[in-house]
Amino acid sequence: MDLFALLRAGVRSGDTPDIGGLTDDRWRELYTAASSQGVSALVWDGIRRLPPESQPSRELRLRWAYNVERIERRYGQQRRRAAELAAAYAEAGIRTVVLKGLAVSRLYPVPEHRPCGDLDCFLCG
């Protein structure tokens, strides 16, 4: 339930997760679960809405923040590659429509935190 509360707070602006008093072990479990499900950046957004005394240890926050930075860099790389690909197709007279991951990420409070895998696009032409 804690993972879902944090995830919900991460994708809904204004929501504050109703959790508190979690042990270090429980926070590590949440980190592992969020990472394995590909939602660690979204859960991080929920954690940042918690009062400082309810957040995980400094050590885990630093580890989590580093992971989120890595996700943000990857997102930036994906956006640049998608733009390069669309430009190459446009040069050949083919219009490109980006689908799913990158396109849907624009609907999230922090688009860079929406997990994206591969690039799905539709070629018109």
Give the location of each predicted region.
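Charged, compositionally biased N-terminal leader segments and the immediate start
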Residues: 1-11
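Helical scaffold of the NTase/Pol beta-like nucleotidyltransferase catalytic core
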Residues: 12-100
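Active-site nucleotide-donor binding segment shared across nucleotidyl transfer reactions
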Residues: 81-125
